[in-house]
Amino acid sequence: MSQVKYNRIILKISGEALAGEKGTGIDPTVIKKLAHEIKLVHDMGVQIGVVCGGGNMWRGETGAKLGMERAQADYMGMLATIMNGLALQDGLETAGVQTRLQTSISMRQVAEPYIRRVAISHMEKNRVVIFGGGTGNPYFSTDTTAALRAAEINADVILMAKNGVDGVYTADPNLDPSAKKFAELTQLDMISKGLQVMDRTASSLSMDTHIPLIVFNVNTPGNIKRVVEGENIGTIIRGDK
């Protein structure tokens, strides 16, 4: 059996990653592949919580820029994350992985309400728990949700699964060929250098709770498993100052 470095994880998946090459909506082929990747880690006995973004369907900031009330636009974004969570739940259960979707906004016909102790109990029973609906409050990103849930469930690490990005760079490597990838950073480094890995609220919370982040390319098969085993891929952001 493979050696596991992280026993309980939060996996943060961007909405764009679920859209595949289309860029918007949900690609069933991507869901199937991602479910397979998560199953590899699940079968190693790792306890898994998943936070999905909603950017493949809607962004609250975009709605606000178009004239919508920001809070209303953010609630729409929260609903988008729940739709993504339902799609991923279906993919995982089709792959044979018991899964529970918990939402911060009550919708009992489709998901459980988020309750911290229940979520931990599910994980201890080897069920994957998907956290939908963000924090349940406007103005907070799903990155902040990932940092918050990681703290609440005592996760060992937050895995920032990026769509085609294999780590944190000094600049956008697509625009600057001389950009260098960081092997390791601290949360304070990330904030002081203005690196756009996650928003400042999420970064500050992760720094306060000392939970490390690993930024890696989720599109490479086997990468989630490699990270959990401790292989040095991507960029690790230490949970200290």
UniProtKB/Swiss-Prot annotation:
The gene is pyrH. Pathway: Pyrimidine metabolism; CTP biosynthesis via de novo pathway; UDP from UMP (UMPK route): step 1/1. This is Uridylate kinase. Pfam families: AA_kinase. GO terms for molecular function: ATP binding; UMP kinase activity. UMP binds at residues 54, 74, 135-142. GO terms for cellular component: cytoplasm. It is found in: Cytoplasm.
